[in-house]
Structures are given as structure tokens and as C-alpha cells.
């Protein structure tokens, strides 16, 4: 699982080190890289495993092939996705297109989201985090704890 938030910087060759815990999780899943695509929810980069992007692709494929919303999702996610392999030191090279979308110049945050993670420009993420915490507080009753735990686990 991808947890926590880490800050790393681009090196002189435009590479960035993916946090060790994120690489370890991906390695445990049998992957030596990540899939990245520009978020259409905010100015960040979405990152996930090959398995996750295959699930997203299946969800898109389940839509009527003649409806334009299928094309919207396929274009916004699949056509924009890039498979990035880790080098020997756990680094990736994000494309200039991805960096521009997220407004990243040098520093970036790797933000764990459970089954996925996001890559943000630090100031943009701090602003988003304030809004996210407020909205999470307002919507906290929407988390249905009982659906996910049996036999009084997690109480």
C-alpha cells in the first residue's frame, strides 16, 4: 500500500527517486516501475501499478463502445499514460508534459493514496490538502466502516 508523503527533487539529468517504500510495494506486486498519467481532477500526476491501470482499462472497456464518454476516459487516462521503469537506483524520468501539467520545476511530493499515489508540486499540494481536510471532515459520515469489517474488527 502507498502511504505517507515524501519530498524529492529532480536531479541534473531530470530524474527523481521514487520513495523506497513505494518501490518496495511495487516490487512485492512484481513490478519494477510505475504507470503515470496527468490527473484530470487536479494539477498532479497519477501513479499506479500495471495491475491498477489494467483494472481502469477494464472499467473503460465495460462502457458502451459507441458512447463518447468511453472515448473521453480512454483519451484522458490510457492515451496519456506512460510506463516508467526504475533505473538501478530507483529513479524515473518524468516527461516534460507530465511535469508541466503538475507545475513541477524541481521539488515534488509523492503522496500515498492507498492503492495509488500522486505526484504534486509542494505548494499546490499544501493548498489542496487544506481543502481536502475540510471536505473530508464534512463528509466523514460517508465512510461506511461496518461494510469493511466483520466480527467487531477495527472498533
Regions found by a protein language model. Give the residues of each.
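Flexible "stalk/tail and boundary" regions
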Residues: 1-7, 12-15, 21-84, 88-89, ...
Amino acid at each position: 500500500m502507498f502511504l505517507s508523503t515524501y519530498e524529492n527533487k529532480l536531479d541534473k539529468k531530470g530524474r527523481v527517486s521514487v520513495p523506497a517504500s513505494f518501490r518496495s510495494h511495487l516490487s512485492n506486486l512484481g513490478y519494477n516501475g510505475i504507470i503515470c498519467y496527468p490527473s484530470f481532477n487536479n494539477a498532479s500526476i497519477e501513479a499506479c501499478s500495471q495491475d491498477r491501470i489494467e483494472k481502469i482499462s477494464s472499467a473503460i472497456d465495460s462502457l458502451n463502445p459507441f458512447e463518447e464518454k468511453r472515448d473521453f476516459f480512454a483519451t484522458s487516462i490510457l492515451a496519456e499514460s506512460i510506463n516508467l521503469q526504475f533505473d538501478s537506483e530507483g529513479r524515473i524520468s518524468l516527461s516534460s508534459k507530465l511535469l508541466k501539467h503538475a507545475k513541477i520545476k524541481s521539488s515534488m511530493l509523492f503522496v500515498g493514496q492507498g492503492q495509488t499515489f500522486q505526484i504534486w508540486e509542494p505548494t499546490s499540494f499544501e493548498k489542496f490538502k487544506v481543502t481536502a481536510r475540510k471536505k473530508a471532515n464534512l463528509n466523514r459520515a460517508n465512510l461506511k466502516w461496518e461494510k469493511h469489517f466483520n466480527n467487531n474488527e477495527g472498533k
